[in-house]
Amino acid sequence: MATLLKGAEVAKALTASLQGEVAALAERGVTPGLAILRVGARDDDLSYERGAMKRCEKVGIAVRQVVLPEDVTQEQLLGEIEKLNADPAIHGVLMFRPLPKHLNDAEARAALLPAKDMDGITDGSMTAVYAGTDAGYPPCTAAACVALLKHYNVPIRGKRVVVIGRSLVIGKPVSMLLLAEHATVTICHSRSQNLPEICKEADILVVAAGKAGMVGAESVRPGQIVLDVGIHANPDGTLCGDTRFAEVEPVVEAITPVPGGVGTVTTSILASHVVAAAKKTLE
């Protein structure tokens, strides 16, 4: 049986570390502040918002909810973003996407200051991730993958990593983050030829294809570390990932469960970005 790389342990350790950093900031008169900007009330947004607020409360981050109606105009949305950009009490902004179809997503992202972009949605943040600078923050889920590997002391340097998925949210940024850790990274996707054979060559396999049960026993071998980033609802209401867990788990060395794996770490990464942004105001 594989070792389960549970996210709760990682989140707990990150939270404890952040609490110390927040206490140090308080001594200098700074309280980290996060604004959660949400348009409408999508169920998945509300679920993540609850988790983020709970995590921030544990850490000591002040959270402000900015909730706009589903029919908000582009001008109203941009106005709220500008207010948050200018507010010194707000060190970071989490803007839920996708936005309703009548809104211009690219324009909204461009309006947000990269320094306050906590989830890597602006072009400035993406540039920082690809350039390897600390001028922005990567998407929380991508950063959670790396944090999880480091917490469990999984060697990354020099290792062969295969990432299935090429999205700007996970696939591409996690590849860049792992490359910065000196891994040898191959990016694959649903149209890659000989995908199972490529996957078997990996020491670390990151599955972020967004397709339930895409990877099974045919794509893994003993000794591998598997990070399953997907999360999907089965017809019976249970959750599953991008791997067929029952097939993969008996073969590999370690795997993240779904639920309870990578996703459990994301709100702690969000909190770490807010704290880092608050610390930069003292530089």
For each predicted feature, which ranges?
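Positively charged, low-complexity intrinsically disordered leader regions
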Residues: 1-30
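Rossmann-fold NAD(P)-binding glycine/threonine-rich loop
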Residues: 106-126, 230-282
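Short beta-strand segments enriched in small/hydrophobic residues
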Residues: 31-40
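Short, well-ordered coil/turn residues at beta-beta hairpins
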Residues: 96, 208-209, 229
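Short beta-strand elements in bilobed, periplasmic/extracellular small-molecule ligand-binding domains
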Residues: 56-70, 185-187
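Anion-binding alpha/beta catalytic cores of soluble intermediary-metabolism enzymes, centered on
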Residues: 91-156, 161
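Glycine-rich phosphate/diphosphate-binding loop of Rossmann-like nucleotide-binding domains
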Residues: 39-53, 136-225, 234, 238-249
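Short, well-structured alpha-helical segments in soluble
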Residues: 76-88
